């Protein structure tokens, strides 16, 4: 059964969409079956996967409000090799419409339940706020991957996010946990970045991924061509970093599965 991970941070511009697209493609490169869900009304993960958000017949919005089933909405990312549940501007209305629906915070979880056996990983790209859409992602998820820049104000925002994850786990999704913190746009030449990184390691320990994602021009260029960096420039530092992250994620899952088995 698929592990479902929400890629979330209430702060924008930290690399959520970049991580979602490139981690999905890198997991495919390790022969895993992957579904990427774009839950951000901007639809950047959709466009970055090579799917035109302006020509969609069905999207994640239609799925959430019950106007289509999953099979009618899913697209395929040719360059990424993963399946995609796309988003467009219609999703902006989802915030209001969902508030009026029964089981509003569980719509995504219920929609995914019948197809979790079809995938190894399901990754959800969340909007940069604790909205009804993000709440749906966190209720559907097994864990949260938090991309973040190593800067001063990021630590303050991280504390709020961790508190919100704990609250959702207590009230709506007992299995929800922080899967890992991912340092993005990382430049080890800057002393502030190293200081913040050390604080993260001290506070979060093994929850902090060993892999760091460097600042890399290829990572910035790839979305404009509608492809993951692995398809755009597989030898770039960005591509190699996300391959390393995929490997680290798979190893963690393997260890976690072994630890959960009865002796």
Each model region followed by its residue ranges:
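P-loop NTP-binding core
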Residues: 1-263
């Amino acid at each position: 059964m698929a592990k479902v991970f929400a890629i979330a941070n209430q702060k924008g511009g930290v690399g959520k969409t970049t991580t979602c697209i490139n981690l999905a493609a890198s997991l495919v490169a390790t022969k895993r079956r992957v579904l990427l869900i774009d839950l951000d009304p901007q639809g950047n993960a959709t466009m970055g996967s090579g799917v035109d958000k302006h020509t969609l017949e069905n999207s994640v919005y239609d799925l959430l409000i019950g106007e289509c089933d999953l099979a009618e909405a899913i697209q395929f990312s040719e360059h990424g090799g993963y399946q995609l549940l796309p988003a467009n501007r219609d999703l902006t209305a989802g915030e209001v419409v969902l508030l009026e629906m029964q089981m509003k915070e569980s719509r995504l979880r219920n929609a995914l339940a019948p197809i979790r056996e079809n995938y190894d990983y399901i990754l959800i790209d969340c909007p940069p706020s604790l909205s009804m859409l993000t709440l749906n992602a966190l209720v559907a998820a097994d864990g949260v991957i938090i991309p973040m820049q190593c800067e001063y104000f990021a630590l303050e925002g991280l504390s709020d996010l961790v508190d919100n994850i704990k609250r959702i786990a207590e009230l709506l999704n007992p299995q929800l946990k922080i899967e890992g913190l991912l340092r993005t746009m990382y430049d080890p030449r800057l002393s502030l970045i190293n200081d913040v990184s050390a604080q993260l390691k001290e506070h979060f320990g093994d929850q902090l991924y060993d892999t760091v994602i460097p600042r890399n021009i290829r990572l910035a260029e790839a979305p404009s061509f509608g492809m993951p960096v692995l398809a755009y420039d597989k030898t770039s530092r960005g591509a190699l970093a996300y391959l390393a992250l995929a490997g680290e994620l798979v190893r963690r899952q393997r260890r976690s599965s072994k630890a959960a088995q009865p002796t």
